[in-house]
């Protein structure tokens, strides 16, 4: 995802970002929350626990909508919508089907695919031709041990976990069983 914003013109669109959508496999909620937390940290997005709304109210929701705020250097805030979407059971690398960042009419998308048995991510941007990159990642548990274990101490991972946990706690308030 980050590689789509290496060019200065693409980086500039992040200052007008208004939507982030993360579609994930049914068993990959933790990965979706961690990715959302990482994006919140990198894009300096925040949310209060009162800014959570459910898009579906019966049983387990199909999506969760969070109203986030981005602060610019002048202290001006703007709204950014974060939507976590529970997708289908189709295979995708690391359980994330698609991530879309929208800024006005511009859309930057990373879509997980499996081509010939090799997990890949297709990247689409209005500023560059589409490209496919192989996924050479490790399991979530291995990443956590590497980032937080002896010799790790990755501050980005701690920040992503903190933001993801806030989202999970906010969602949990709305997902408790009735009765």
Indicate residue ranges for each PLM-predicted region.
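ATP/pyrophosphate-binding catalytic subdomain of soluble kinases
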Residues: 1-68
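Long, compositionally biased intrinsically disordered terminal regions
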Residues: 35, 41-48, 57-179
């Amino acid at each position: 995802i980050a590689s789509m914003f290496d060019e200065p013109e693409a980086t500039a669109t992040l200052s007008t970002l208004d939507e982030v959508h993360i579609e994930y496999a049914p068993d990959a909620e933790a990965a979706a929350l961690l990715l959302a937390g990482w994006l919140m940290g990198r894009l300096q997005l925040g949310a209060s626990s009162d800014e959570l709304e459910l898009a579906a109210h019966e049983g387990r929701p199909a999506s969760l909508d969070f109203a986030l705020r981005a602060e610019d250097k002048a202290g001006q805030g703007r709204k950014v919508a974060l939507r976590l979407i529970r997708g289908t059971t189709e295979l995708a690398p690391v359980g994330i089907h698609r991530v879309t960042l929208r800024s006005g009419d511009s859309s930057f998308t990373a879509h997980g695919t499996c081509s010939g048995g090799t997990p890949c991510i297709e990247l689409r941007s209005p500023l560059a031709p589409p490209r496919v990159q192989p996924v050479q990642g490790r399991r979530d548990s291995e990443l956590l041990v590497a980032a937080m274990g002896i010799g790790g101490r990755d501050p980005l991972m701690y920040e992503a976990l903190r933001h993801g946990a806030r989202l999970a706690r906010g969602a949990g308030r709305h997902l408790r069983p009735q009765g």
